């Protein structure tokens, strides 16, 4: 697996829920957080013309952010950034306070999720182009397939999941860990395996791969249909205390 590169990130995560006044019967059983169709969608807020004029060449980055039940985005992180993508990184991180998503749904109710995706900026025929995909799988990114990877759900009433903490050997240490997960069509994690950790040997991979087996995800969707998924999920560690907890 290619080396994960932690670039620039902002992570002031507040875990809170605001339940909108929506009838559960009007919502599907599962729906991932999606790009909205409003002017404040992430793909509409990123100013591709300005990026080209300021000298941004082809660039790619992966991102994660918290999406609330109101559809607001928070705590954007960017990583695995291609060389020379600094202007794109700054543009993406600067838009998180404005962006709106279509909120996720779990068992017919809106739910907060941790969403991951990829942003690809490229120039073709002298014009800028921007693609925002809600997965980070190499083959799906190459093909541009309609795949929304499973999203970590901040689901209440799941006492088995006790959260993800720093390993005892490295409390408060900045780090990155990637795990390969299998998630079924109910959102249950059926398998997890460490794919990468940096710095190595301090237990960050195991600190994610073990607890995440008890977490709940919004299942993955391919071509609009629920599918079991085998995918890579990345978590960055920084700041003191708990990294991820669902309640």
Predicted regions and their residues:
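Charge-biased low-complexity segments
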Residues: 22-247
């Amino acid at each position: 697996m290619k080396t994960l590169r932690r670039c620039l990130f902002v992570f002031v995560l507040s875990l809170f829920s605001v339940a909108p006044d929506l009838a559960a019967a009007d919502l599907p059983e599962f729906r991932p957080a999606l790009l909205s169709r409003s002017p404040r969608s992430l793909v509409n807020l990123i100013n591709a013309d300005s990026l080209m004029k300021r000298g941004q060449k082809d660039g790619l980055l992966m991102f994660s952010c918290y999406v609330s039940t109101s559809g607001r985005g928070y705590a954007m992180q960017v990583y695995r950034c291609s060389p020379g993508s600094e202007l794109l990184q700054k543009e993406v991180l600067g838009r998180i306070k404005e962006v709106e998503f279509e909120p996720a749904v779990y068992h017919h109710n809106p739910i907060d999720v941790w969403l991951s995706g990829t942003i690809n900026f490229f120039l073709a025929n002298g014009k800028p182009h921007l693609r925002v995909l809600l997965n980070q799988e190499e083959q799906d990114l190459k093909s541009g397939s309609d795949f929304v990877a499973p999203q970590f759900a901040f689901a209440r009433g799941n006492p088995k999941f006790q959260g993800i903490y720093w390993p005892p050997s490295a409390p408060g240490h900045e780090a990155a860990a990637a795990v390969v997960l299998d998630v079924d069509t109910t959102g249950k994690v059926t398998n997890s395996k460490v794919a990468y950790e940096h710095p190595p040997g301090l237990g960050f991979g195991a600190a994610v791969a073990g607890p995440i087996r008890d977490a709940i995800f919004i299942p993955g969707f391919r071509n609009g249909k629920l599918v079991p998924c085998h995918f890579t999920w990345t978590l960055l560690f920084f700041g003191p205390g708990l990294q991820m907890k669902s309640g």
